[in-house]
Amino acid sequence: MCGQCLPLLLPKGKTMAHVAPASYSIPQKALHWLMALLILFNLIFSDAMEEVAEAYERGEVPSPDDLTFANIHAYVGIAVLCLGLVRLVIRFTRGAPPAPAEEPPVLAVAAKLAHGTFYALFFLIPLSGIGAYYFGNETAGFVHGGPLKSLMWLLIAVHILALLVHQFYWKTPVATRMTRG
């Protein structure tokens, strides 16, 4: 986002200094953990969606159980999409804590890139899933269950690894910003 556009998104009379809190707000923390649970649920329990797609490809009717679980997967994905939008609005209006002073600048840039990619995936994964499930778009289905899903798993692993490095190597209290801080 351009530096000239950002002031337009800030509350009236606020500057970036006012928007950079020391910790995430309770709504931000709640959204983070709720979305983490929903995303992990959908990443782990996607088999029924694949069964439904394969049944349709074979010209068969999917089992009622597979349809039920595929619908749950779809509804959870739509919830992630909606919560991602709320989370983005809160992030623009409230801001986020600054990177710890001890963090090397190159890793601070990498963290911003990773967080930006997370936000993109909060929208791209559900939208591609909607395209595949509700509109039968095979390309959307491939992108949804292939590269985007793999990228989400990779980002989750990097996110956890970065947290562990902050906590145990640099001894920075980054985890408390999203838990109790």
PLM feature segments, named:
Residues 2-181:
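Membrane-embedded alpha-helical bundles that constitute the cytochrome b-like, heme-associated redox core
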